Amino acid sequence: RKFTAEEIKQAGLSAQRYRGTGDMFRGRLMIPLQDAQGRVVGFTARLLKDVKDAPKYINTPQTLLYDKSRHVYGLHLAKDAIRRSQFVVLVEGNLDVISSHQAGVRQVVATAGTALTEQNLKALSRFTDDIRLCFDADRAGIAATERAIPIASKVGVSLSILTIPS
């Protein structure tokens, strides 16, 4: 099927440039973002090479299908393992989820970076109320972990903090 430039833009795959419309994800590894049923709703992309002043990751902008505050990466793959184990491990990044699943640890999902929301925890609470948070041990990860505690309390889930030595 052929898509119009407007349809591509509305899907969050292109951006307006000074010379017209351009590929938003050029020079990046694209990772599909899927909803809880496994349908692609957006993309995140990581730089393949370091580029000065360029963000390491970019996401599809907010669209009708993709809402960063509600999205839980990997949930469609992890939900059966979460039900069986009766807990979920919540990590920062998509690549953390991919690595965990490759190693056979399947009850792992991610937020969009450190931006944990009530909506993320409510989505996870449909499968378990035992949330095990394992954010990175850097400043951003520690700050996000501290922000997560009152959010978990408000949602009414049990939150444990896991730390991995650096």
Regions found by a protein language model. Name each.
Residues R1-I131, A144-T145:
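Phosphate-handling DNA/RNA-contact segment within nucleic-acid enzymes
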Residues L116-S166:
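Conserved phosphate-handling catalytic cores of large alpha/beta enzymes
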